[in-house]
Amino acid sequence: MKISHFFACLDRLRLIQRWSLMRNIEKENLAEHSLQVAFVAHALAVIKNKFYQGHLNPDRIAVMAMYHDTSEIFTGDLPTPIKYFNPKITQAYKEIENAAEAHLLALLPKELQADFAPYLDSTQFSAQEKHVVKQADLICAYVKAQFELENGNQEFKAAKARLETLMKTWHSDEMRYFIEVFIPSFGKPIDEITL
């Protein structure tokens, strides 16, 4: 059998630091972020189905979210101000991300590629699935910014304001539900959230 480097590459997610241009009270790596996004994306899909006439597959969305930033194994975590500096850079970076996704998928044994492609190849995601994963990504970034600010790190003030604006753009009923029901618990002491 031929050796595959796929999971060794995924293991590198824990080495990629997010928010790399900002001082962090608590560092966050891409593996941690991806798991949190998967939790939130799954919840958003369940909430949409339960309360807002959705027809999403929460399990599929959770796995998509687990893999949503895996292209950064090859590209690194490009800071947002650079990624969205102008439309040409944004488009070029999207092409790089697509090439990185294809390369990662090609690291799998050929017999497994078709089974993983629906979660790794963003061209196979529906607009609604992408929307839910993006919402989860924004919520998790917002939670991080809020944590940093609550712990005295003013470096995240502009990031939180930018995220609040983006969250309004990506808003949905399920996102509002999640924010109202779950976000207030973040930052509370362990004794308050476990009793």
UniProtKB/Swiss-Prot annotation:
GO terms for cellular component: cytoplasm. It catalyses: a 2'-deoxyribonucleoside 5'-phosphate + H2O = a 2'-deoxyribonucleoside + phosphate. PANTHER family: 5'-DEOXYNUCLEOTIDASE HDDC2. The record marks 18 as: Appears to be important in orienting the phosphate for catalysis. Homodimer. This is 5'-deoxynucleotidase PM0747. Keywords: Cytoplasm, Hydrolase, Metal-binding, Nucleotide-binding. Pfam families: YfbR-like. Catalyzes the strictly specific dephosphorylation of 2'-deoxyribonucleoside 5'-monophosphates. SMART domains: HDc. Coiled coil: none annotated. It is found in: Cytoplasm. Its EC number is 3.1.3.89. One of its GO terms (molecular function) is nucleotide binding. Substrate binds at residues 18-19, 33, 69, 77-80, 137. A divalent metal cation binds at residues 33, 68-69, 137. Residues 30-142 form the HD domain. Its cofactor is a divalent metal cation. NCBIfam families: PRK03826.1. Belongs to the 5DNU family.
